[in-house]
């Protein structure tokens, strides 16, 4: 099971019009920043450090990973995540678009179940008219999708067969050691158990110290209060 990732949208008003371009084009974070936005979601989730789509796009430009009149070079993800100490690589170079039963989809599913995140390049279909990166994760026995360009149900809970048919490449992100950390929400039962344990330790400490000068002063304070 994955830790639920931070959700970022490339078309967020805070940065959608910020430049994500090289000489000879006029693209923005909103129009071409899906890849860096996926990376930003992973990086902030794993490290806890604020790293926005704008930050990721700036890093991509500075390090030469913005593709002229396209989006982001496939080679971007590995060094971007490595800059934060996160292991990442492309699953392989086999294009799986139009191949819903290809073994790479099963390999991707197995990685998700082990605690990896996946970044998938989608081709023409429900997610894009050309090419689009999405972040994929696993929770409660289901594949989940963080689409950096949409929160529509059809895009974040898309049909698994359609997804496999339209996914072209995968990049894996090793988040196992982070996802194994305790990050569940506090429940009443957990609180009660923690309180019970703490009170037991406190009472034992009182019994261990119920003699000598400390105990005498404590009793005097209690009487005078």
State what each model feature region is.
Residues 44-179:
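Conserved active-site-adjacent core of cysteine acyl-enzyme catalytic domains
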Residues 1-70, 186, 212:
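Active-site-adjacent structural segments surrounding the nucleophilic cysteine of cysteine proteases
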Residues 182-225:
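N-terminal propeptides
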């Amino acid at each position: 099971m994955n830790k639920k990732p931070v959700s970022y949208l490339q078309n967020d008003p805070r940065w959608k019009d910020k430049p994500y371009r090289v000489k000879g084009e006029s693209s923005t974070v909103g129009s071409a920043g899906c890849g860096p936005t996926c990376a930003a979601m992973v990086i902030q989730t794993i490290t806890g450090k604020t790293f926005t789509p704008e930050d990721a796009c700036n890093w991509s430009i500075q390090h030469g990973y913005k593709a002229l009149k396209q989006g982001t070079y496939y080679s971007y993800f590995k060094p971007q995540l490595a800059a934060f100490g996160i292991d990442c690589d492309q699953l392989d170079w086999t294009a799986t678009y139009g191949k819903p039963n290809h073994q790479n989809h099963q390999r991707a599913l197995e990685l998700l179940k082990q605690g990896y995140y996946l970044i998938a390049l989608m081709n023409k279909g429900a997610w894009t008219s050309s090419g689009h990166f999405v972040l994929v994760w696993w929770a409660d026995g289901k594949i989940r999708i963080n689409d950096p360009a949409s929160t529509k149900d059809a895009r974040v809970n898309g049909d698994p067969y359609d997804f496999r048919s339209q996914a072209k490449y995968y990049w894996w992100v090793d988040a196992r050691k982070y996802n194994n950390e305790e990050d569940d929400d506090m429940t009443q039962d957990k609180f009660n158990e923690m309180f019970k344990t703490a009170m037991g330790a406190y009472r034992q400490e009182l019994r261990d110290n119920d003699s000598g000068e400390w105990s005498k002063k404590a009793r005097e304070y209690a009487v005078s209060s």
